Amino acid sequence: LSVTVDDIKLSLRIDVTEDDPMIQSYLDAAKDYVQTAVSKNEDLTVYKQYDFAVSLLTQFWYQNRVTDMKQTPYQVISMIQQLRGLIS
């Protein structure tokens, strides 16, 4: 499984396509963020927690794009910690 722009749009109930490039950039950044936070060498895409963390983080960034985002949502941190435990 891999999270797609359409998955994010469905979750956020977005019907327009104007924001697709922005959502894709958030999605790419979220994948890198979670991967780097856990392990640069492990393939995390086999874990459901990876997709969930990527989806949550992408949605968070999209919904809060005009605010100062200093904290990663607790749920994302929880998924990252679970992934770290799974690969150790």
Model region roles, listed by residue range:
Residues 1-88:
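Divalent metal-cofactor coordination and adjacent catalytic microenvironments
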